[in-house]
A protein has these predicted regions:
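ASCE P-loop NTPase motor core, strongest for the SF2 helicase catalytic module
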Residues: 160-202
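Charged, low-complexity intrinsically disordered regions
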Residues: 1-167
Length: 202
């Protein structure tokens, strides 16, 4: 009897365990905090191929206190065409754009002009902003194409996602045991209707 009860308990637990989600069911927004820093670091290095001498200095960091992302030494790779042209602009490098993207911010380019009091004030440069935002969209697109390509990375991210977010299955209500005293016998309720009544009762 104990074995049978234990088996039933295991089956009941297995029945309520949510199915693990696969890569095709998981959306990864660039900058999502559940993605390890090393994954973003790898993406940056593979996309921008920084100069060998500065590669180890340019690091993506995340503040535990604020959740903000930053890229250290983002000005170190000045002669990189990918950073300055392909994925960046002459006014904003790809490292600056990636940092803003990780923080879910739209990039903007400002010119600073002096007012009548000699104080510098920022004025949005619409043309340069449009170019920078075009590069930002390109980086997002490249990230979406890249994120699931590597099998090891895919398995790692699926495991982290399922452990972090997919541990609780929404409660389902079973109303099969409910007796409807005095109800018109001509009326038969469908299973989902009975379960909905159970939801209200419990």
């Amino acid at each position: 009897h104990q074995k049978e009860a234990a088996r039933r308990n295991v089956e009941a637990l297995e029945a309520v365990q949510p199915q693990d989600l696969g890569a095709g069911e998981i959306g990864v927004r660039i900058g999502a905090n559940w993605v390890p820093v090393e994954v973003y670091q790898q993406f940056m290095v593979e996309l921008l191929t920084p100069n060998y001498y500065v590669r180890d200095r340019i690091r993506i960091l995340r503040s535990e206190a604020t959740g903000q992302w930053s890229i250290r030494e983002k000005n170190a790779d000045r002669s990189n065409v990918k950073a300055n042209t392909t994925y960046g602009t002459k006014r904003m490098s790809a490292y600056h754009i990636l940092e803003q993207t990780l923080n879910q911010r739209d990039v903007r380019v400002f010119d600073y002009i002096e007012d009548e009091n000699g104080k510098k004030k920022p004025v949005l440069n619409k043309k340069e902003t449009a170019i920078a935002q075009d590069r930002q969209e390109l980086i997002k697109q490249k990230f979406a194409e890249w994120i699931w390509k590597d099998i090891d990375r895919r398995e790692l991210l699926c495991r982290i996602y399922n452990e972090t977010f997919n541990g609780i299955r929404p409660r389902e209500y079973d109303g099969r045991h409910i007796r409807f005293e005095g109800m018109n016998p001509e009326i038969s309720l469908r299973p989902h209707q009975i379960n909905a009544i159970a939801h209200i009762l419990y």
